[in-house]
Regions:
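Residue-level signature of transmembrane alpha-helical cores of multipass secondary-active transporters
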Residues: 45, 49, 98, 141-146, ...
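Interfacial segments of alpha-helical transmembrane regions
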Residues: 130-151
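Short amphipathic alpha-helical coupling elements at transmembrane boundaries
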Residues: 127-134, 206-211
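Transmembrane helix-loop-helix hairpins at the membrane interface
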Residues: 6-12, 26-29, 150-156, 161-310
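Juxtamembrane loop-transmembrane helix junctions in multi-pass integral membrane proteins
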Residues: 89, 93, 132, 176-179, ...
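N-terminal, membrane-interfacial amphipathic/helix-forming hydrophobic leader that caps
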Residues: 1-128, 276-310
Length: 310
């Protein structure tokens, strides 16, 4: 029976922000935060961006190199690099492993972001990005944002078609080379990629830039950075890259207007969800159409593995 000075608790349901002290439970207090006035600067934000790129380039190697050794490749051979590269772009299992490696890459990137933003738990994480619904609309804002994400996807498809979307992208070649890769990419696009990408670009990078150089310059810079990093995935298709640029500028403007990151994540997630559904059901639709031979794998297909994020 708790005394008048005690707050009853239940095993497994303790609040991680509550600190027990002499029979009392004291709520852990974080300093006040402003999403438009972060504690980090432009230099730190760009270092985090570079670190996220390096993580996404290195982690896949930890999967493909052991697989190459398992397949009998000799690491002391002068042709090991060439043979491993050939294996990576021709073997369906190797391709699947590289795509699968994006999940721990996302987890590690989120851990890096948490350490950077919170100073290892000294500051709140989500609140630092402006995480919340509109005070006037509440959760109804979510439904509107989902609709906007779906609408943006439709506009993006029309834009890509208008500018030429008939050229197969490197990402499409990668997806068509492995059934397992198709499903993993679809799942990552919905459940992890929107968080990682928004936290990095419109969370860490934009918030520091808008304070240093102003909103307009920050929007343009993030637009360029976001579009540039998708070039390896979607080249040489200018239409698809234009659709990516459209998504980026809308998301960044919404972040600038609302001062909150949650709307960007919801829109990004719904945009990706439409693409993921189409990705999953595409093979079944293709069975009803005349068969066309898939493009031959090339070394350039490895470039999208640096950034399997829609």
């Amino acid at each position: 029976m708790p005394t008048s000075n005690e707050v009853p608790t239940f095993p497994g349901l303790e609040d991680p922000n509550v600190i027990p002290h002499d029979g009392l439970q004291i709520k852990k207090q974080f300093p006040a935060v402003d999403a438009n006035n972060p504690v980090w600067g432009v230099g730190g934000a760009l270092l985090v961006w570079i670190a996220s790129i390096l993580v996404q380039a290195i982690i896949p190697l930890l999967f493909i190199v052991p697989f190459a050794l398992h397949r009998g490749l000799n690491p002391s051979s002068p042709d090991f690099g060439r043979a491993a590269l050939e294996l990576a772009v021709t073997d369906p299992t190797a391709i699947f492993l590289q795509v699968l490696s994006i999940l721990p890459t996302h987890i590690l990137t989120l851990a890096l972001l948490w350490a950077f933003v919170t100073r290892f738990g000294k500051r709140p994480f989500l609140a630092s990005f402006g995480w919340g619904w509109s005070r006037s609309l509440g959760v109804f804002e979510g439904a509107a944002l989902v609709g906007l994400g779906v609408l943006l996807f439709g506009v993006g498809v029309m834009l890509a078609t208008l500018l030429g979307a008939d050229k197969p992208t490197k990402l499409e070649q990668l997806i068509n080379s492995s059934t397992g890769a198709r499903y993993v990419i679809a799942a990552l696009a919905v459940f992890t990629a929107p968080f990682v990408e928004e936290f990095v670009y419109r969370g860490v990078v934009y918030s520091a830039l808008q304070r240093a150089v102003g909103v307009k310059a920050a929007v343009v810079f993030v637009l360029g950075l976001f579009t540039l990093i998708h070039v390896p995935q979607y080249s040489p298709n200018i239409g698809v890259l234009s659709a990516v640029a459209l998504l980026s500028i809308v998301l960044t403007i919404i972040r600038a207007y609302t001062g909150r990151l949650l709307p960007c994540v919801v829109i990004h997630m719904s945009f990706n969800a439409v693409q993921a559904v189409l990705l999953v059901f595409e093979p079944y639709v293709q069975r009803l159409l005349p068969a066309t031979p898939p493009p031959a794998p090339t070394a350039s297909m490895l470039l999208p593995l640096i950034r399997i994020i829609f």
